Amino acid sequence: DFVEDGAKLAISEMIKSGTTCYADMYFFPTVSAAIAREVGVRSQIGFPVFDESSGRSADSYIHEGLKLHDSCKNQLLTKTAFAIDSLNMLDSETLSLIATYANELDLPIRIRLHENASEKSVSVNRFGSRPLERLIELGMLQPQTQLAHMIKIDDHDIQLLKNNGCHIIACPESNLKLDNGFCPIEELLLHGINVGLGTESSACNTSLDLLGGIKIVNLLTKGFSKDSSFFDGHQSLQMATLNGAKALNWQDEIGSLESGKFADFIAIDIRNIDCFPTANMASAIVYGSSGSDVSHCWVGGKALMENSELKTIRESDLVNITQKWSQKLSLARSTVKGNRNL
């Protein structure tokens, strides 16, 4: 119930703020996939692989995920990917198995990587190589690989990323909130590396408003580059749309409005005063608008929101869900506090 309700809340928030497709990696991926299809949003569901410290073997996670992959083969709305929360927690045998399946089935591999300063030293001490070097050794750094965060990287790392054609998902709001640093987007783009934009989870970021995050990544990138002309509004919007589709290996079907692609698009109410002036529309959207300005959302030509009203899920149900879990969590906190006082 927790994952099902959380998925409903998160998907609703994303639709309300203009997201038509998202990538996910969490427990019970079959539940998340079912909710996404029920609501009608497009998704790439990552099935997580953990080590035995989670109470289950890595093999069981892999085979459960492959069952989900098989069930989604003919789904237009849902794709799947391997998802690795911590590279340092998995042994090389497990990672090699993931690489083998990924190559055989043409499955993407999504990895949270270089999210903090200790990852490199832990990898070197435990496995004898840096994280990216280890991925290369195991055949996991390839054009199907999605690396989220990548904030603690140097010139050597950037060259490895370029040489192997993988994709970066920058999550600046989460990184800043947790005081972890900032992905060197300018350097990555200058080296021709594809960078998409993400929000991270509500646990790390609180907000899933990707449109609002575009402004933050734009201003930070300009600030670090010390060049106000670098990374303009159009480039910023592309990072949140087509670049993201490329990272998911979905660019032939989504990411831009073109003949032959799915009709996934949104409408932004530019009559709102925060969007003025509109002489440069890309600039108005990036610097003046936020997710609250989105009025309509379509996925595959189907309306998921019209005039700011969700069409495939009842907002009254969402209110009930939040109230239910608020009460449960409050009770749990009170119980824990009471036990500590015994």
What are the residue ranges of the model-derived segments?
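Divalent metal-coordination and catalytic microenvironments
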Residues: 18, 36, 82, 112, ...
